[in-house]
Amino acid sequence: MTGLLSTVKIAYGYKKFENYHTTPDAVTLNKYLHKMLDAGVSHCFMEVSSHGIDQNRIKGLVFSGGIFSNLTHDHLDYHQDFKTYRDVKKLFFDSLPKTAFALINLDDKNGKYMLQNSVAKKYTYA
């Protein structure tokens, strides 16, 4: 069974919950991950926001992979500028372990940048 943590909802099995933040606060996030484990979830697909990275909401979690689709100017109200926003997103890929994968969209000009310091197995698409 798989789980989902996204902007739209949190779901696993037949359970569905509203989600109010793309990446919930660390306590809420771990509560749902624990419930998923108890329900038999083996994998969780999680949307990780730049806010979640910057505010350490995912600190301590070990990801088996990450997917970069694109960067837009969506969160410049929170981040000082586009470079800061991009660098925060890059921290996620920098933190992936060697055993993880990084799947990157090369159609986005920031794709290659995300891979620069990542030790994860690298895959690309365009």
Residue spans of the language-model regions?
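Acidic/polar active-site rim loop that often engages polyanionic ligands
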Residues: 9-17, 65-72
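Conserved helix/coil segment N-terminal to the catalytic DExD/H
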Residues: 51-59
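Acidic, Mg2+-coordinating active-site environments of NTP-dependent enzymes
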Residues: 64-126
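Short gly/ser/thr-rich secondary-structure transition/capping motifs
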Residues: 24-27, 46-52, 83-87, 124-125
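Conserved nucleotide-sensing/catalytic segment adjacent to the nucleotide-binding pocket
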Residues: 16-49
